[in-house]
Curated annotation (Swiss-Prot):
<feature type="active site">
    <location>
        <position position="179"/>
    </location>
</feature>
<dbReference type="GO" id="GO:0015068">
    <property type="term" value="F:glycine amidinotransferase activity"/>
</dbReference>
<dbReference type="GO" id="GO:0019872">
    <property type="term" value="P:streptomycin biosynthetic process"/>
</dbReference>
<keyword id="KW-0808">Transferase</keyword>
<dbReference type="GO" id="GO:0006601">
    <property type="term" value="P:creatine biosynthetic process"/>
</dbReference>
<keyword id="KW-0045">Antibiotic biosynthesis</keyword>
<feature type="active site">
    <location>
        <position position="227"/>
    </location>
</feature>
<dbReference type="GO" id="GO:0015069">
    <property type="term" value="F:scyllo-inosamine-4-phosphate amidinotransferase activity"/>
</dbReference>
<keyword id="KW-0759">Streptomycin biosynthesis</keyword>
<comment type="pathway">
    <text>Antibiotic biosynthesis; streptomycin biosynthesis.</text>
</comment>
<comment type="similarity">
    <text>Belongs to the amidinotransferase family.</text>
</comment>
<dbReference type="InterPro" id="IPR033195">
    <property type="entry name" value="AmidinoTrfase"/>
</dbReference>
<comment type="subunit">
    <text>Homodimer.</text>
</comment>
<comment type="function">
    <text>Catalyzes two non-consecutive transamidination reactions. It converts scyllo-inosamine 4-phosphate into N-amidino-scyllo-inosamine 4-phosphate and N1-amidinostreptamine 6-phosphate into streptidine 6-phosphate.</text>
</comment>
<protein>
    <recommendedName>
        <fullName>Inosamine-phosphate amidinotransferase 1</fullName>
        <ecNumber>2.1.4.2</ecNumber>
    </recommendedName>
</protein>
<feature type="active site" description="Amidino-cysteine intermediate">
    <location>
        <position position="332"/>
    </location>
</feature>
Length: 348
């Protein structure tokens, strides 16, 4: 029986991969890092700081990921952790060379849909070989009967990036490129964020890989930067949490217009370490749904917790102290690969 079987973001959770902060670092500045992550923050890529994150940040984060793993295990969830590797090692192709990033966010590079797990063609050169951290896990999933795909490795040449273009237009359409975290699963419907971490060709490739059973919905003008899981968060069938700074009547995905929306309240700014944060205060709504009536939420976001409880969602309050520093909350730092339930179409 395939150990990979997941159709949406909310069915009762059975198995998950939790990332690691060990060896996390900011990769050397190159055209990809500058265009995708820092073009609004610095005048040139030479100004972007690089190197390991502070030891304190990594130690505290690894301890908090261990707590998350323990709490999920207590709930009967099978938890997997990636192997450790040297993220400072050189990554090179005939076109470029760089060093690595981190293995903190399995959500970014792996997409599980049904009984298929896909290695996505990620936007940053530094993440070109990130799936190696999960190779042993993927081999086990493949042996269990899962379908294992790797998207075509992108060239990621300089022409792929336009740092001076407006946000949302800095990733060109020369080849399929997308981070897995640009995708949300709603049964047969998949939301695909067209942004600086996912282009139009990426959506086209994903549709061709999954076939006619699924409908990939490219969403444009929703959020210009990277990833979608701090913009729209499905809680259960018919109920979705939305970011009021990004989602409105004009850009709400058509297939979600019949869903009840919960507007995320103002979030607590949890701060960050270093020169600039890796993500905004909205990382506070980056929660992990364990089952339709339970979610893992940052304990500091008391306003959000009250709103969720009002809508029948109990909360397991935990903490990732450095989520703004490392660029990921509970959804980013995990990858759910098996949930109970079957494939359905959700229209209301």
């Amino acid at each position: 029986m395939s150990l990979v079987s997941v159709h949406n973001e909310w069915d009762p959770l059975e198995e998950i991969i939790v990332g690691t902060a060990v060896g996390a670092r900011v990769p050397r500045a190159d055209r990809s890092v500058f265009a995708v992550e820092y073009a609004d923050e610095y005048d040139s890529q030479d100004q972007v700081p690089a190197g390991p994150y502070p030891d304190r940040v990594l130690k505290e984060t690894e301890e908090e990921l261990h707590v998350l793993s323990e709490e999920l295990t207590k709930l009967g969830v099978t938890v997997r952790r990636p192997g450790q590797r040297d993220n400072s090692a050189l990554v090179a192709t005939p076109d470029w060379q760089t060093d690595g990033f981190h293995d903190y966010c399995p959500r970014d590079g792996l997409l599980a849909v049904g009984q298929t797990v896909i290695e996505s063609p990620m936007a940053l050169r530094a993440r070109f070989l990130e799936s190696l951290a999960y190779k042993d896990i993927l081999l086990e999933y493949f042996a269990s009967g899962a379908r294992w795909l790797s998207a075509p490795k992108p060239r990621l040449a300089d022409e792929m990036y336009e740092p001076t273009a407006p946000a949302g237009q800095r990733l060109t359409d020369l080849e399929p490129v997308f981070d897995a975290a640009n995708v949300l699963r709603f049964g047969t419907d998949l939301l695909y964020l067209v942004s600086d971490s996912g282009n139009e060709l990426g959506a086209k490739w994903l549709q061709s890989a999954l076939g006619s059973t699924y409908k990939v919905h490219p969403c444009r003008g929703l959020y210009a930067s990277t990833h979608v899981d701090s913009t729209i968060v499905p809680l259960r069938p018919g109920l979705v949490l939305v970011n009021p700074a990004r989602v409105n009547d004009d850009n709400m995905p058509d297939f979600l217009r019949s869903w009840q929306t919960v507007v995320c309240p103002e979030l607590v700014d949890i701060g960050f370490t270093g020169d600039k944060p890796h993500c905004s205060v909205w990382i506070g709504m980056n929660l992990l749904v364990v089952r339709p009536d339970l979610a893992v939420v940052d304990r500091r976001q008391t306003g959000l917790i009250k709103v969720l409880e009002k809508h029948g969602v109990d909360v397991l309050p935990l903490q990732l102290t450095h989520s703004r520093t490392l660029g990921g909350g509970f959804h980013c730092a995990t990858l759910d690969v098996r949930r109970t339930g079957s494939l359905e179409t959700y229209r209301f």
